[in-house]
Amino acid sequence: MSETNTTDAKTVPAEAEKKKEQSLPFFKLFSFADKFDYLLMFVGSLGAIVHGSSMPVFFLLFGQMVNGFGKNQMDLHQMVHEVSRYSLYFVYLGLVVCFSSYAEIACWMYSGERQVAALRKKYLEAVLKQDVGFFDTDARTGDIVFSVSTDTLLVQDAISEKVGNFIHYLSTFLAGLVVGFVSAWKLALLSVAVIPGIAFAGGLYAYTLTGITSKSRESYANAGVIAEQAIAQVRTVYSYVGESKALNAYSDAIQYTLKLGYKAGMAKGLGLGCTYGIACMSWALVFWYAGVFIRNGQTDGGKAFTAIFSAIVGGMSLGQSFSNLGAFSKGKAAGYKLMEIINQRPTIIQDPLDGKCLDQVHGNIEFKDVTFSYPSRPDVMIFRNFNIFFPSGKTVAVVGGSGSGKSTVVSLIERFYDPNSGQILLDGVEIKTLQLKFLREQIGLVNQEPALFATTILENILYGKPDATMVEVEAAASAANAHSFITLLPKGYDTQVGERGVQLSGGQKQRIAIARAMLKDPKILLLDEATSALDASSESIVQEALDRVMVGRTTVVVAHRLCTIRNVDSIAVIQQGQVVETGTHEELIAKSGAYASLIRFQEMVGTRDFSNPSTRRTRSTRLSHSLSTKSLSLRSGSLRNLSYSYSTGADGRIEMISNAETDRKTRAPENYFYRLLKLNSPEWPYSIMGAVGSILSGFIGPTFAIVMSNMIEVFYYTDYDSMERKTKEYVFIYIGAGLYAVGAYLIQHYFFSIMGENLTTRVRRMMLSAILRNEVGWFDEDEHNSSLIAARLATDAADVKSAIAERISVILQNMTSLLTSFIVAFIVEWRVSLLILGTFPLLVLANFAQQLSLKGFAGDTAKAHAKTSMIAGEGVSNIRTVAAFNAQSKILSLFCHELRVPQKRSLYRSQTSGFLFGLSQLALYGSEALILWYGAHLVSKGVSTFSKVIKVFVVLVITANSVAETVSLAPEIIRGGEAVGSVFSVLDRQTRIDPDDADADPVETIRGDIEFRHVDFAYPSRPDVMVFRDFNLRIRAGHSQALVGASGSGKSSVIAMIERFYDPLAGKVMIDGKDIRRLNLKSLRLKIGLVQQEPALFAATIFDNIAYGKDGATESEVIDAARAANAHGFISGLPEGYKTPVGERGVQLSGGQKQRIAIARAVLKNPTVLLLDEATSALDAESECVLQEALERLMRGRTTVVVAHRLSTIRGVDCIGVIQDGRIVEQGSHSELVSRPEGAYSRLLQLQTHRI
């Protein structure tokens, strides 16, 4: 995995460079708005226009008031009257702004939430409508989860309040022009002339950022897939000590994202710097001509002030509107990916109106001259002129070598794929012409690897028939021999099964899958190795149940184990893409052809006892009751108690608390900011440089304010020579400030981007490292679903960067501006400054109330969206099951249900936020009115001057904007605080099984002597269900030990405990006489090889999957391991050989091929201890025969633990242990145990023998 993923990560830049910039037209982001949304957007836009226009109107009034100040300095009574009148106008204006800003914020926020909820629904609906081939080639689970969790949030950011914000600033710009033209049209015209330069700088910045954003998203999506794979297959990663491989691959993948972040920082610094620089120089030009016009008598100081200030604020607003372009660019790039899927028309249409329904289905299926290759490997032909007929009501078995195309027959009948040529007919009608939903309603499917969803047992069975009654569900479960073990669970049918059914044994999962298919009561039954995971007792009863349910139905049985199909109506043998033999068992045996050869191969591995089938039912029924029912009930601590609650911590974080493990409760650490700074210590030089840049940027605002206030005073000079001299002086200051702004903004944003990107990368690496340090039991919990964790990994680190790195930059800048402004104000006029200081708490309180209104919703929204990511991830990863059971609408319904919480809360949130924002605006205008009135009062008393009051007032306006901007960052800072808490809850968790324990003894070599001594064990997720009680087992070094017993008896638990996935509650698990808890876990696992029942492969090449077994494996070593596992032959036959990608979770390979690669991986590891959990269950007879010999060679001289349902595969082991009721009830060699006819092993053997 590591090599391929590393290579992929390195090729990302080249691919990204070649890719054309992909972005959606902005208006198309609103494609999912309904009439109410349009009304909300209209009202919100109207509010934004009024709100935006208020500032130029304020300056119009202010300019007239300045004239009242300047022209009435000799008539103090008239001056106070004029100022008081305009102060009242400011209060009225504040009320208008209060209501308009409320409408702007409330309507746009709520509309954005509504539209994105519709987008999420439409996106998942479109994903689920795609044909299965799409998921083989174009979509990975990690990509879908990333889109649902991250891309939709980017779109929401782009179409919510930021649109209102953009309209608001654009209105300020346009209204500024209007007011400017009314006041002094020549100055306004001059202002218009310089705007294109400002717009060009901003547009170039936005264009550059769009390209970088698109590439960055693609790059991180690749990294997210690597993380999701590692977490989803954590048992394989742990077993092969692959944590560092996963981390290295992930690190390599995000390295390119890091470099793109640096570029984005430079682009932002240069973009904003140039925008403000050009704006400053433009203001200098306007100021110069304003002085000329005043001296020529073409205007006065008040009108010039109004025109200039309107132009300046208009220009600044244009620049501020550009700050939203970054969010729009990200939204467009994310929207493109979403809309690409939404608009993609699947090859196989699911539309109910597309196709016809048959009045009656008999079930005759015919393949006529079918040629087929998988879309992912079009050059590898599976079928050539393939012909086969499945008669109505008959059972036909399809057999052949692993990879011969048996399961492909099932996929084509289900219409997961369409043939390249030829026809597939149902009752003489080509299935392409039938409605897809109708077709699949007639078919019941049980796969080789059962796919369950992370919900209750009841809900999983109900996928077969959503409207089924409880009686029907229990009948289906009883028929599948599942009812007995389900009813013994504390919560029965309401028990949660965990992600992919991880809380159940393989047999239990398969029985639930069979119950699901039986509930459907289909006309056609497709059984793809449906009983392969069952123990002898369960298989016997389930096989009888299947025999009953098969009566009267067209049944297609795909089988490796030929003993299960001897009584079918017909058997078809597939070789090299064609049917080479058909007939009954007896007919084919008599031919001594391909089928007879397969039988001989299977007999070589020990299945020789073909008793009279007529005795099967009576004997199995009698014998099934002799086994303890309890032993069938629970695997591994099977199912967890799903009970959990939500609570709000003291710091406002929403927490999910498992009742089974309350000690896991986490809160955002109180000192998280200090810890985050410490975590960021390697970037201190960059942080300091960024801080210096922020401080330098912070001086720009006060400098502008001071020069501006001085210019107002200059406009009332009666000495025109002094006016000209001073104007020239201030113009040069503005030009210098423009050049200064470019450097200051570049230093600020570039260095803070380096700090932020490095912090994000480090946090992501540390989080994944911490996640992969947790014990396996942690991953068994619902809240640690792989899709949820992958989404958390993607968003939390980005939120930390946004809230901390990026926002520290703005806060430092604004705080510098605030401090500088107040120092200047107190020096100029301390009385007015004191009043300003007195009004600030009112302004801050209003904004703080807004912050509090937002704080309570972050947790709810994040939690609900995380759950939607989990549902989407499950739906995609189990897409074949979803498609086969027409469960798209059910998945979509669950998805929409989880979206209701944020939708309901968003209404209240938007209203509250809008109201409090409006209140803060009213406080601002009220404060300004009070200050101006008080200033006029001081002037009238002779204790201050017109110049001082205006200077302090202008400083107030600039400072208030800085405070407002700082406080407006509250939502992002709150979200970042939540994310920091989430990050540290992951980093701080103390794993219960530390793989890197410094005090543990390193393991250089082991003999392989294993002992379980008085072990009590229950799974952490279900501590009340004991798997082992006083369990004792000794396995001598170099010997082979088989473990048998009923499904759920705890066989796989032995292997899990040897791997130390879990620790015992009491007693010891010892290797070479040492408690394994005292041994270094990673060095111990290097000595152990594991092959699981369901092989876990990574989305890499075949070569990399095998090489995963040994660091630095050579090509010859990989090929030798593949030969030993009987995999070299089929691998060599592929066009790309060992470089063939296996697809996500090995989807491009058959079950047998996947298992052989997994075995080759274990062979390459060359372990001292070998753990085989049904290692050959997925193989056909020929492959199993060769592979069994390879395994026997591999087992020589090694301690081997074999978990087996098929007793024929373990007759040659040194010792066999029978597990029942949490203990070893019988132990000995095959011959010794067979000599005890009433023993547990003999009963199991009789069951298995007589089912044949």
UniProtKB/Swiss-Prot annotation:
Brassinolide binds at Y276, W283. Residues 365-601, 1010-1246 form the ABC transporter domain. The chain crosses the membrane at residues 42-62, 88-108, 163-183, 187-207, 274-294, 308-328, 688-708, 732-752, 822-842, 914-934, 949-969. It comes from the Eukaryota. It is a multi-pass membrane protein. Disruption phenotype: Reduced rosette size associated with decreased brassinosteroid signaling. Reduced sensitivity to red and blue light-mediated leaf positioning and morphology associated with reduced auxin efflux, thus leading to constitutive upright petiole angles, and irregularly wavy and small rosette leaves. Aberrantly enhanced organ bending, including increased gravitropic root bending. Reduction in bulk stem auxin transport and lower levels of shoot branching as well as small increase in branch angle when combined with the disruption of MAX2 and MAX4, genes involved in strigolactone-mediated signaling. Residues 965-1252 are annotated as: Interaction with FKBP42/TWD1. Coiled coil: none annotated. Residues 41-330, 687-975 form the ABC transmembrane type-1 domain. GO terms for biological process: acropetal auxin transport; anthocyanin accumulation in tissues in response to UV light; auxin export across the plasma membrane; auxin polar transport; auxin transport; auxin-activated signaling pathway; basipetal auxin transport; formation of plant organ boundary. Phosphorylated by PHOT1 in phototropic seedlings, to modulates auxin export and distribution and regulates leaf and petiole curling. Induction: By auxin (IAA). Induced by red light, but repressed by far-red light. Induced by brassinosteroids (at protein level). Brassinosteroid exporter that, in conjunction with ABCB1, supports the accumulation of exogenous brassinosteroids (BR) in the apoplast, thus promoting BR signaling initiation involving the specific receptor BRI1 and required for plant growth and stress responses. Mediates the transport of castasterone (CSA) and brassinolide (BL) across the plasma membrane. Auxin efflux transporter that acts as a negative regulator of light signaling to promote hypocotyl elongation by mediating leaf tip to petiole auxin flux. Interacts with 1-naphthylphthalamic acid (NPA), and FKBP42/TWD1. This is ABC transporter B family member 19. It comes from Arabidopsis thaliana (Mouse-ear cress).
